[in-house]
Amino acid sequence: MNLMEINACILEELMDKKIILCVNVKGYFQELDKKYHVLNRVAFVVDNYDRKQGYTECEGYRFPVYSFDYLNNINIDDYLILITSEYYEEVYRQIKGMFPDHINTTIYHYADARIHYYNYFSNKFKEKPLENKIIFCSGAKKAYNIESGEFDDNSLALFEYMLENKLNMTYQLVWVVLHPEKYTQKYSQYENVYFLPYRWSESKDTNERRTYYENICLAKYFFFTQATDIATHRREGQIRVQLWHGQGIKSRALFTHDEYRYEYMTVMSEKYGDLHAEIFGLRQDQILVTGNPKQDWLYHPLDKRIFDVLGIPKADKYVFWLPTMRDSKTEVLSDDSINSDTGLSILEDECQLDRVNEQLRQSNMVLVIKRHPFEKCNTHMVKTYSNIVILDNTMLSDRNIHINRLLGYADALISDYSSAAIDYMLLDRPIAFAIPDLDAYKSSRKLHFDNLGEWLPGIQITTESQFCDFIKEVRDGVDSGKKLRQNAFKKLGKWRDDNNCKRVLEALHII
């Protein structure tokens, strides 16, 4: 077998053959049809993910979607097999592994604009040595045009650590973002720091395209939090590191086999290393047990004057609540849906919030609720309560504030399924888990642990009364969940320090 990029001449030459598309990616189908008008020739689609099988529709066409095993039922020489994925080499390996070595069929792949340009420039720069250049990226795929989280999380923590330790004098530090102008001024005093517009990856301007791919093709290291689309392919010697968002109690919604999508993934402990190797399809030697860079922020919170900027009043004690915020109109429980007038679990109506607010007022305590990034803002909740402050994602992202930069001031934390609770566990302070919908949530989202109570680093609360009791415990300095937290740390944790960034860079021999 061999792999070749499809083009108009090949499609015309093989006009008599029906097409099999691998894999089910509608965006690729649309682009493919716009360029070559071939969807009318498609026989079926193959995809190994169960949730993508069945049928798919695109541009008025409806195709059956089978697993890859279906290819064993046909004579593949009768078809034109066309890979529709940015990870076309990975898909090709899967297909090739299904057939004997003597099969001499050519497998084709469609290259979108970014892949086409990358292939061109990687060939152009292949004789140039790699440079002391590190690329950073954070958040969802830039192709989705989602700004939220694009300059944040573990990638940002590692970047700022490198600046603090003057590693920008050894390496060029380059961020791929949607809007460089938002960040350029803040870091203008640093040498060798650049912000590269993602749009240049498909720019019509030759110089912009060249600049973008010269950085991508010659960088030694890539660090990303979540999406890997800036480095779906690499040349020999380049190292891609998946920092992810952290480790929590919920698993991934969709398994992907990431073994060839990056070289390493960082985790906070051996237990999470085993879990992530399984759910990301990685080898054990790809797991770096270093701790998560953003956990260092817990030990170095921002100047407390930021509370004035965020409208957080002075108090004797602060309890932070990081709920998985939910939409009251959605029936299926997930990361962004729950039946509640307030969008909160447990405190589901304003009367309950009134009672909790009064308890906080009498105790000179403040409850800080940090919204889920995708939750719509209920501004009346912000204005109504004297001792309850609600922070939405925009308030923080506009000021480049990650929640871990504030949690160092939290005397206690209330969470549910967020990885922030596992981060906060390192500070060894009280944690409560507001999970009244546990059974329903498990039916919609897989968790790492079946016997969850044995793994949680804190007590479980399911009612308003228990919520208020936890507030009282914090007020009185009672820590009823201490043993639970200690037991959980023994199983899930490893370090309680601010050296995670350092360990990541040491593991990669950057320092």
Predicted regions and their residues:
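Hydrophobic, well-ordered beta-alpha structural blocks that scaffold small-molecule cofactor pockets
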Residues: 1-124
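Active-site and donor-binding regions of nucleotide-sugar-utilizing enzymes
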Residues: 26-27, 133-300
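Active-site donor-nucleotide binding/catalytic segment of nucleotide-sugar enzymes
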Residues: 122-123, 127-154, 304-376
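Catalytic donor nucleotide-activated moiety binding site of glycosyltransferases and closely related
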Residues: 172-193, 322, 326, 353-396
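Donor nucleotide-activated moiety binding/catalytic core segment of transferases
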Residues: 197-200, 204-219, 373-422
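A donor-sugar binding/catalytic signature common to diverse glycosyltransferases
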Residues: 220-247, 398-445
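A nucleotide-sugar donor-handling region in carbohydrate enzymes
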Residues: 249-253, 260-344, 373, 480-487
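Catalytic binding pocket for nucleotide-activated donors in carbohydrate/polymer assembly enzymes
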Residues: 384-386, 392, 417-492
